[in-house]
Amino acid sequence: MGSLKEGQGRDMEEGESEEPLLMAQNQRFTMFPIRYKSIWEMYKKAEASFWTAEEVDLSTDVQQWEALTDSEKHFISHILAFFAASDGIVLENLAARFLNDVQVPEARAFYGFQIAMENIHSEMYSLLLETFIKDSKEKDRLFNAIETIPCISKKAKWCLDWIQSPMSFAVRLVAFACVEGIFFSGSFCAIFWLKKRGLMPGLTFSNELISRDEGLHCDFACLLYSLLQKQLPLEKVYQIVHEAVEIETEFVCKALPCDLIGMNSNLMSQYIQFVADRLLVTLGCERTYKAENPFDWMEFISLQGKTNFFEKRVGEYQKASVMSNLQNGNQNYEFTTEEDF
């Protein structure tokens, strides 16, 4: 997969040395005083959303798995294989690059907590594969999906290339906003389709928790980007987003078609474009696809339904009192999921 050394050894691009987020701080080893209240609030939201794999009951899923069609089993197992690998890739980017790039303690605190959550996500997906897949050779193939499954290898290579890239923090930040905001969107949506059908309650509950975590991680990337003094030319943002849309569409509509579980591939393609438009707007760009959300049931869950996420969660998702000190907190940055851009 290549070495990280070439990316880590790069010099700062012109203008980066003057970026407050990236400048070495004398007080970077102590948390207070907080310089960016909006970043601190995002960290406290992440802290309030902690959960563990032990909270997810898979007993019903084990019974329902046997009743699924071969096509449904194929689709779900490959989606889980992608997720199990991708969380490790995101974790490596955080540990090897972003924690070295960013010098603000409250931003590092968020990344540190995100690393913990990515580990839990990876554990959850691995546990799902371990629970559902009994054949040892098939299990080994799925656990090594980056090497053994071409459509997953292509997505992984795009991510790994950005980890190793010598390009600016701003470029890599947008790329990984796409990883968490676009690369996961089709797969999340497909699993929520199973929830709509009343299938696999443990899988779909864990998907809800993880998709909301990833939505927050994507929001955080957009927040940091909004705080950069030198942002990218719009054309560069569009280029990165378009690449991500093409790869995700090919993955979930062609290579691992969602019609295996009864979904319409054309509507899934439209949904991915809708998600991309929303990300573009959050990054300060204009919508490029002009796509509407074709799945009205996604309004209440996942990326589109986060407005009440930290106030209301099935199963007591928010840890008690963690957010109490932020009720009247900073309002400098607020991500909305309204469709009217």
From Swiss-Prot:
**Molecular function (GO) terms listed?**
metal ion binding; ribonucleoside-diphosphate reductase activity, thioredoxin disulfide as acceptor
Q: Write out the residues that bind Fe cation 2.
A: 118, 180, 214, 217
Question: Which residues carry out catalysis?
Answer: 125
Q: Where is this region: Disordered?
A: 1-20
Cofactor stoichiometry and binding remark: Binds 2 iron ions per subunit.
Q: Which UniProt keywords apply?
A: Cytoplasm, Deoxyribonucleotide synthesis, Iron, Metal-binding, Oxidoreductase
* Cofactor list: Fe cation
Subcellular location as annotated: Cytoplasm
List where this protein forms a coiled coil: none
Cellular component terms per the entry's GO annotation:
ribonucleoside-diphosphate reductase complex
Query: Which biological processes are named by the entry's GO terms?
Result: deoxyribonucleotide biosynthetic process; DNA repair; regulation of cell cycle; ribonucleotide metabolic process
Quote any Pfam family the record assigns: Ribonuc_red_sm
Explain what the UniProt record notes about the effect of disrupting the gene for this protein: No visible phenotype, due to the redundancy with RNR2B and TSO2. Rnr2a and rnr2b double mutants have no visible phenotype.
Which residues belong to the signal peptide in this entry?
A: none
Which catalytic reaction applies to this protein?
Answer: a 2'-deoxyribonucleoside 5'-diphosphate + [thioredoxin]-disulfide + H2O = a ribonucleoside 5'-diphosphate + [thioredoxin]-dithiol
Q: What is its EC number?
A: 1.17.4.1
UniProt similarity note: Belongs to the ribonucleoside diphosphate reductase small chain family.
Q: What else is known?
A: A substrate-binding catalytic site, located on R1, is formed only in the presence of the second subunit R2.
Under the heading PANTHER family, the entry gives:
RIBONUCLEOSIDE-DIPHOSPHATE REDUCTASE SMALL CHAIN (PTHR23409), RIBONUCLEOSIDE-DIPHOSPHATE REDUCTASE SMALL CHAIN A (PTHR23409:SF35)
| Functional description taken from the UniProt entry | Provides the precursors necessary for DNA synthesis. Catalyzes the biosynthesis of deoxyribonucleotides from the corresponding ribonucleotides.
**Protein name listed in UniProt:** Ribonucleoside-diphosphate reductase small chain A
